[in-house]
């Protein structure tokens, strides 16, 4: 199916099959469509609402065209990532959590990008911390193998996305592509925590990942609107495990953490986010740093559970608490910066 045929279907509120969506996405991602066609298709899909079949088709093409990171094993390798777009401008919780996960002895293949609507994306934060971003897939694999954590800069691995950049920017609205980033990890991880901007997406995206071969995934959205586990409100979870998706709510107290407000956790820049994270990961914390640490532990614990490094969410949170308070997570952040600096010298020589 070509994009003109797809547009005719979509404007009449008719769904595409997985194979039809693959055909259209391949046209879009290989530069065969005009920007007007891409913009019209994205808006038509949003107004119709994307189906699980359509998202599966779109994700499979993005994965197919990605510059992949080949790891020795995917067993227990985890990613923690969010769609963004929650409007809260909270510090980079998932990125900070990644270093706690690594400090707990679990391998992390982190996928992320610069901020689109927020103040600080994962790439912005890591760059502020001195981490070199423009790594080759082989260099990322070496980071993961040697440091226990590596960062895959989305724009370096999904070059075909350049064809959608103009229409997405000009539309200025959430589209199908806001959902695709967290589902297209270039290392092909099968264990994830995925935060989403709308609770209604939790189960559908868990179903998408089930069909695409994921093993253990938590897709989450908090009652106070965050695309991650919240310290201040219950969080809704769609959990994919053992080939089935179950749904439930989790309170911080269920996991041994006291609920408290998010006051003080919003940031205005990557530098401010980094300052708060270094405070939270350090041995001596300010009051706000302690609160940030609790938020990090909550989310890192969920990822340790998704990685099957823990047998329950509560056990994962306990392991994350211990790992954060050793100070090793902060050392991991510095270690990744030093390790990638060597690649920067190689690449820019």
Curated annotation (Swiss-Prot):
Anthranilate 1 binds at residues 82, 113. Pfam families: Glycos_trans_3N, Glycos_transf_3. InterPro entries: Anthranilate_Pribosyl_Tfrase, Glycosyl_Trfase_fam3, Glycosyl_Trfase_fam3_N_dom, Glycosyl_Trfase_fam3_N_dom_sf, Nuc_phospho_transferase. GO terms for cellular component: cytosol. Mg(2+) 2 binds at residues 227-228. GO terms for molecular function: anthranilate phosphoribosyltransferase activity; magnesium ion binding. SUPFAM superfamilies: Nucleoside phosphorylase/phosphoribosyltransferase catalytic domain (SSF52418), Nucleoside phosphorylase/phosphoribosyltransferase N-terminal domain (SSF47648). Mg(2+) 1 binds at residues 94, 228. Binds 2 magnesium ions per monomer. Its EC number is 2.4.2.18. One of its GO terms (biological process) is L-tryptophan biosynthetic process. It catalyses: N-(5-phospho-beta-D-ribosyl)anthranilate + diphosphate = 5-phospho-alpha-D-ribose 1-diphosphate + anthranilate. Anthranilate 2 binds at residue 168. Pathway: Amino-acid biosynthesis; L-tryptophan biosynthesis; L-tryptophan from chorismate: step 2/5. Keywords: Amino-acid biosynthesis, Aromatic amino acid biosynthesis, Glycosyltransferase, Magnesium, Metal-binding, Transferase, Tryptophan biosynthesis. 5-phospho-alpha-D-ribose 1-diphosphate binds at residues 82, 85-86, 92-95, 110-118, 122. It is an enzyme of class 2 (transferase). Belongs to the anthranilate phosphoribosyltransferase family. This is Anthranilate phosphoribosyltransferase. It comes from Pseudomonas syringae pv. tomato (strain ATCC BAA-871 / DC3000).
